[in-house]
């Protein structure tokens, strides 16, 4: 176990500074289209919404991040395409939109056919799970800028205007259903890599809790695509949705100004316990950085909670309160 108490900022990602940078950029984006295609919401929610008559078009863009460096280390790239799709699709689902089309952006140091085939394998698998088409993309060779590769994409979704879920219906007393993640997903990997680099382990070592797989392979487990949320929306009265990604539970502030009391959270997978132990990472930093076993949240009246839990394989993990974010006795701030 590390004697240090590593943080995300120690690894090079300062969430506070990142938020200030994003805010500065957004302040410059002053032009707004009018009429058909005009934005229905401001910038900052899970997806941007555009006026399209009875419907809203929803747009998201995201990438795999530094998880690709572990793929390079393991020389296995057939899952990062799933991650790329998942990070975008899950953000669409978090505002109630159905994904319909995707375009990818692959920036390369150099071209390798075998590598590209594996990237494509993951992309098509993710698209199949999401029930949408990949309609194009861009491949750029940038040897002076890129070392290795970077993978990102943009996703288009559609939702009836009266079915958009932005969190305005969330009320005190609503129940929170937590839906399990498959592990670390695609956030916090700069800290993950820092922990492994400073530990006694390598990516090719067996997991200490499961000798049947290597640490690197465990960390490459694809991000879960929560497409069953569409079934929840049809069957239940949903008040709010949340995709737990970068900044962990802190991102819940974009859903509602009310509070979240996670009195019975899902148990974090063993990979989180391993990373926390090896990096000496404090509980608060873990929940500020990772999904900690809960990759998606559904907020709804108690009458529909059991139904939502059954559809998603989740469980009731908490309730909406007046203020704050709390996981048992831990205050997230």
Curated annotation (Swiss-Prot):
One Pfam entry name: AIRS_C
Compartment(s) of residence: Cytoplasm
Catalyzed chemical reaction(s): 2-formamido-N(1)-(5-O-phospho-beta-D-ribosyl)acetamidine + ATP = 5-amino-1-(5-phospho-beta-D-ribosyl)imidazole + ADP + phosphate + H(+)
Swiss-Prot/TrEMBL keywords: ATP-binding, Cytoplasm, Ligase, Nucleotide-binding, Purine biosynthesis
GO CC annotations, alphabetized: cytosol
Domain of life: Archaea
EC number of this enzyme: 6.3.3.1
GO molecular function per UniProt: ATP binding; phosphoribosylamine-glycine ligase activity; phosphoribosylformylglycinamidine cyclo-ligase activity
Annotated metabolic or biological route of this protein: Purine metabolism; IMP biosynthesis via de novo pathway; 5-amino-1-(5-phospho-D-ribosyl)imidazole from N(2)-formyl-N(1)-(5-phospho-D-ribosyl)glycinamide: step 2/2
Any Gene Ontology biological process: adenine biosynthetic process
Family: Belongs to the AIR synthase family.
Name of the molecule in the record: Phosphoribosylformylglycinamidine cyclo-ligase
Taxon lineage: Archaea, Methanobacteriati, Methanobacteriota, Stenosarchaea group, Methanomicrobia
